Amino acid sequence: MANMTLVKTPMPEQDPKVRARNFKEVALGYTPEQAIEEANRCLKCKNPKCVEGCPVNVRIPEFIAKVQEGDFKAAYEIITSTNALPALSGRVCPQETQCEARCVRGIKGEPVAIGRLERFVADWYRENINAMPEKVESNGHKVAVVGSGPAGMTAASDLAKMGYQVTMFEALHTAGGVLVYGIPEFRLPKAIVANEITKLEAQGVEVMTNMVIGRVLTIDELFESGYEAVFVGSGAGLPMFMNIPGESLVGVMSANEYLTRTNLMKAYNDDADTPVIKSKAGAVVGGGNVAMDAARCGMRLGAEHVYVVYRRGEAEMPARLEEQHHAKEEGIEFKTLCNPIEIIGDENGRVCGMKCIRMELGEPDASGRRRPIEVPGSEFMLDVDTVIMSLGTNPNPLIRSTTPGLETNRKGCLIVNENEMTTREGVFAGGDAVTGAATVILAMGAGKKGAAAIDAFIKSK
């Protein structure tokens, strides 16, 4: 029976007062009954637009129809025919600007909760079946994948399904890329990422950690050792700073480092020996999802006050509305239309405050957003002992600098053609290494496209 309710079926969540001090997952997921209730909101459009908004082309109406029937296994099989990582995308994909943005139900009310349903199906399968994929017979061709984040994992999975012998190289000691070092446990439990890595290994993908391509091995050496193509999905891990006075003080760090220490190296665990600054009052500079993650981690690590300092207004914040909402519920204070101009230190070289100036919005800039302009004489002090810079990241130049013929743009992003091939024949790339910091699902889409292009390239030789 169709469910004509104008709003989504609510997702159970941890109480904000409780979750603000723990790292357990915030969103608890649908029950089977709730999933079926939400699936029944789908109108079964003859010409569904939702699929057009999905970077990995999930057959959304088909999987939702199976959820309506209670056939969750079939729903999972439909999703994974094009999306290798539904438990991940169902949690961190910005559906509100993609598939759900095109849902007809959104015209008069809220769209169908496609992301929540995808997550439910993936979780149900993992908890009730969790069958490992079968290894496909080898076609005798070797491909290297550099980086084990969403782009690399997707490319490796698709290539393995085609019969390629795939080796995935990860620079850190744990595979998963940004999924393990960047996204906190309370948004994406690491056990889920580990399960996806296990599935890749079941497909025959060899996962090699502590392998920094460009230092331990170069791209040229990969080709010399028999790999016929290389996919570079090494992400964008080089943080940007403001270059204001005081950035070298103790207590200032990038969100990239802060989240890596907290998430990958488990600084939140009292048994871990990972050093991380546990502040009483912290400021996170920036307004994206990474800024929200850093601010929410700061609160969980014991801070009494955490501020998000952003130079534009709240309406211009790039962070997902859901992440902003969760941050506010947990006690994070937003300081919008403000910009730091100096970080103040004490006699020991430690942060003791941040001098800011108020901003106003002028005419739109090249990004289409109104340009922030300083308001003269509006300086004020923010009493903080920690400052986390979350201003975006660029790709690390290591691979480019050690690979002849590999060209990048002015931001250090690899230049690729319409088939994801770089300026070096046989080297393909996708994800943040090409686009700069973007979304998990766009990286997954690039991984799919890169795998298909590598297959065509090798077959054409």
Predicted regions and their residues:
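Local cysteine-cluster metal-coordination motifs and their immediate loop/turn environment
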Residues: N40-E62, P86-I107
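Glycine-rich dinucleotide-binding loop and its adjacent helix/turn
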Residues: V121-E137, N195-R215, P239-L301, T408-N419, ...
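A conserved FAD-binding loop/helix module that cradles the flavin
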Residues: A433-S460
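Rossmann-like dinucleotide-binding cores of NAD(P)H-dependent redox enzymes
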Residues: M168, L172-Q203, V207, A295-E342
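Feature captures the FAD/FMN-dependent oxidoreductase FAD-binding
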Residues: A74, E137, K142-V146, A194-I244, ...
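N-terminal Rossmann-like FAD-binding beta1-loop-alpha1 element of flavoenzymes
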Residues: H141-T167, A291-M299
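Ferredoxin-type iron-sulfur electron-transfer modules in oxidoreductases and energy-metabolism complexes
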Residues: R19-E37, R59-R91, K108-E137, T262-N263
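FAD-site-proximal beta/loop scaffold in flavoenzymes
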Residues: S248-S279, P364-A437
